Amino acid sequence: LGHPEVYIVLLPALGIASEVIATNARKPIFGYRAMVGSILAIAFLSTIVWGHHMFVTGMNPFLGSVFTFTTLLIAIPSAVKAFNYITTLWKGNIQFNPPMLFAIAFVSTFITGGLTGIILGDSALDINVHDTYFVVAHFHLVMGISALYGMLAGMYHWYPIMFGRMMNKNLGYVHFWITAISAYGVFFPCLLYTSDAADEQLS
C-alpha cells in the first residue's frame, strides 16, 4: 500500500529516541501515556494514508479529500511525539554526548520531515510539487535520515552495555557533525530548489 513501511522503519527510531533522550536529560519522558497513544495512532493511521501518493493520477476528488484528511490527521500524533521530546529536554540536566546528539538530530529531521509532509498531504499543494526534489527531500529526511539517526543513537547508547567497552567520544562527535552537516547539506537545497521548479511548472 506504499506508506506503512515508512512508519514501520520509523517506529523503532521513535522508541530509541525516547530512551536516549530520557536517559541523557536525566528525567522521565514527558507525557508517557500520550507517547504510547500517539505511537499506536501512527501505527494505525499509517495504513490509511497511502492515497496521497496518487493525487496526480486522476483520483476521484472526494477520495482525494478523504486521503488529505487522513494524511493531515497523522500529523497530530507525530506532533505530540515531537512536543513531548522537546518538553522532556526542557530544564533537563542534559548530557550532550554522541547518542544524545543523534537523538536530538532525529527530532530535528522528524520535525522537518513532518512539516514537509503536511505540504505533501494537501492534494492542492501536492499537485504543484509532485515529481520535484521537494518529495525527494521529504522522503529521505523521514525514511532515511531519521531512521539512520535513530539507529546511530541506539548504537552509541547501547554499545557499552552490550560489549562492556566504551566508544571513543571524540570520534563520536566527529561522526555526528559530519553526518548532520552532510544530511542537511544534501537535502535542504532540494527543498529550496523545489520552489523554483514549482514556479516553472505553474508558469
Where does each model-flagged region fall?
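Long, K/E/R/D-enriched contiguous segments that form extended
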Residues: 61-94, 98-105
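Membrane-interface helix caps and helix-loop-helix hairpins in membrane proteins
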Residues: 54-61
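Hydrophobic cores of alpha-helical transmembrane segments in multi-pass inner/ER membrane proteins
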Residues: 7-15, 72-84, 144-154
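Interfacial and helix-entry/exit segments of alpha-helical transmembrane bundles
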Residues: 29-44, 87-117, 133-136, 141-150, ...
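Short aromatic-rich membrane-water interface segments that cap or initiate transmembrane helices
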Residues: 1-5, 67, 71, 130-143
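Short helix-boundary/re-entrant hairpin motifs in multi-pass inner-membrane proteins
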Residues: 1-51, 80, 105
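Single conserved hydrophobic/aromatic residue that forms the stacking wall/gate
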Residues: 193-202
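Juxtamembrane/interfacial segments at transmembrane-helix boundaries in multi-pass membrane proteins
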Residues: 1, 90, 111-132, 195
